[in-house]
Amino acid sequence: MILLLLALISATTAFQGDVVNLTLNEQATVTLDECMYFLDTLQNSSTLPPGEYGIKITHSCLGNEQIEIRTNTTTDVITIKVEKDPNPEESLVEAENEVLSLRKEVQRLEGEVSYYKKLFEVLNKINVDLYDKLQNLATENDELKRELELYKSKAGNYSQLIDELRLELSKMNETVRQLQATNEDLQANLTKIDAELSRASANLELFQTLFFVTLSFLVGSAFALMRR
């Protein structure tokens, strides 16, 4: 292993198809030769935080290949000597197996993509329906607010009308009380007048009796004088 200021590389000599590990001691931008790529990102250039990263050396690599490690302050270069694959048949079988595995993974991912597309369409439709419902609810809410304001206005008018009616009723009650008092006074006066009328009737009868008695006496006296 070679100790560098920025990174450690697990091997400086490798065969085609091998994987070497790069350990970064600090964040850096790492650029690989085009015949190599990072196992995690499948790219040959990435800005990476400190950590260990696997680098795949493809069969297109041969000879001295370079890895550039760059930070804001410094740049280092690691050279890896890539030798020809000693067992190309095994590598071919491994590559075929890897391709088959990748195809299966692609099919699985395509299935997931198809599922998520359908799920997205369903969720999007639900979202559209919910949006429409929200719009309808917002419209209904605005209408209810307008109706509420109208009812509040009517309630205010009704409250004013009720106050006016209560005032009018109070005046009418006062008038009724005054009329009742007047009626009571009239009833008292009628009672007095009735009593006076009863006394006057009794006196009239008495005077009528006295009148007829006096008249009878005078008539009798007149006949008596005429006989003499």
Curated annotation (Swiss-Prot):
The chain crosses the membrane at residues 206-225. It comes from the Archaea. Coiled coil: none annotated. It is a single-pass membrane protein. Residues 1-16 form the signal peptide. Keywords: Membrane, Signal, Transmembrane, Transmembrane helix. It is found in: Membrane. One of its GO terms (cellular component) is membrane. To A.fulgidus AF_1225. This is Uncharacterized protein AF_0540. It comes from Archaeoglobus fulgidus (strain ATCC 49558 / DSM 4304 / JCM 9628 / NBRC 100126 / VC-16).
